[in-house]
């Protein structure tokens, strides 16, 4: 990443963290929904973020949207949930794993192909067995015979980078994620869903590195595709990675500006006694699961495994979704290493507000 971009990005990330934007209630969930919505919109979906939020949270399909659009978004949501699991567990990237991601992305909308070289099913994540082009009369992607060996080369490259991700600065993590996106979509391992899977892998790298996951904005689709095409024709990722860095910087800048503007307004959960005094709005968010988590933490600093053991939980996914994530989103629990959420040394403790709530409900 160019030095000017690097400096600007680091300043914005520092400001993002200082303001606590990522620690807002429901920020992580709603930001993920935005990422999913923009990714499917690039592929033609017209479902909005608001419609996806209602569909994901309440199971209510958006009126006036096709079944295919609904399924595309639901499939991608399941794929991102799987990616979050992989990032949290630091699972090694393998060909079966990438195929599993593709299978989730295409689960309900994938086609079955019968070719001279055999049969393959998009819904199963099968690699393509025929050649494809970007568009009618457009450039052709890698010959299908080369897809599997080149994908394995990509996997080896990516695992080598992920092995050192804890020692990387944030701009370097983003660089790796952009490069991963470029390499995978250029190989084009599947007949369909390559863009969604490539963006998912990009976000997986970002999640594993503990930086803010990036949405590729659908309103910049033309510029995004143009940057990708120019880089592919040039045989270097420089143009594409530069474009992605500029998009990230612009998105973060807008987020910070909007937050600072909105923060000037009164915030419902604050009162005259300060932010560490629980109000009805805060205590109403303390589910039985969150209450158990607060009691288990007390004055201690514990890692996720220790917390699960104290709570008698074996399901890591349920623990994260029903206990830990809700407590963090509510501002009741914080990470000891907030700039590296996926760090192996990560531990959790009560915030000042969490201590007050624990005392109030104890």
Residue ranges, per PLM feature:
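FIC/Doc superfamily catalytic core
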Residues: 1-192, 196-362
């Amino acid at each position: 990443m160019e030095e000017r971009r690097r400096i600007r990005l680091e300043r914005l990330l520092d400001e993002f963290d200082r303001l606590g934007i990522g620690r807002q209630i429901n920020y992580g969930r709603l930001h993920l929904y935005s990422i999913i919505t923009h990714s499917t919109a690039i592929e033609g979906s017209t479902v909005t973020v608001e419609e996806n939020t209602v569909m994901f949270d309440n199971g209510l399909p958006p009126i006036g949207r096709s079944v295919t659009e609904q399924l595309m978004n639901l499939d991608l949501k399941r794929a991102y949930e799987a990616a979050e699991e992989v990032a949290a567990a630091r699972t090694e990237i393998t060909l079966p794993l990438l195929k599993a991601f593709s299978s989730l992305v295409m689960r309900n909308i994938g086609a079955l192909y019968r070719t001279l070289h055999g049969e393959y099913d998009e819904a199963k994540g099968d690699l393509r067995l025929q050649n494809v082009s970007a568009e009618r009369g457009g450039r052709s992607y890698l010959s299908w015979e080369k897809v599997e060996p080149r994908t394995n080369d990509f996997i080896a490259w990516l695992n080598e980078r992920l092995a050192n991700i804890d020692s990387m600065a944030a701009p370097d993590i983003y660089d790796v994620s952009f490069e991963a996106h470029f390499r995978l979509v250029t190989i084009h391992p599947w007949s369909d869903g390559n863009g969604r899977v490539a963006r998912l892998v990009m976000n997986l790298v970002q999640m594993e590195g503990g930086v803010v996951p990036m949405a590729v904005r659908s309103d910049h689709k033309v510029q995004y595709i143009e940057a990708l095409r120019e880089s592919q024709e040039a045989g270097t990722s420089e143009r594409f990675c530069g474009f992605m860095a500029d998009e990230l910087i612009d998105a973060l800048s807008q987020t910070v500006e909007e937050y600072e503007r909105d923060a000037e307004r009164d915030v419902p959960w604050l009162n005259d006694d300060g932010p560490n005094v629980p109000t009805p709005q805060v205590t109403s968010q303390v589910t039985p699961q969150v209450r158990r988590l607060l009691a288990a933490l007390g004055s201690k600093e514990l890692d996720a495994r220790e917390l699960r053991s104290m709570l008698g939980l074996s399901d890591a996914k349920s623990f994260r979704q029903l206990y830990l994530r809700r407590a963090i989103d509510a501002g009741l629990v914080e990470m000891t290493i907030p700039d590296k959420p996926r760090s192996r040394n990560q531990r959790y403790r009560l915030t000042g507000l969490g201590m007050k709530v624990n005392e109030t409900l104890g």
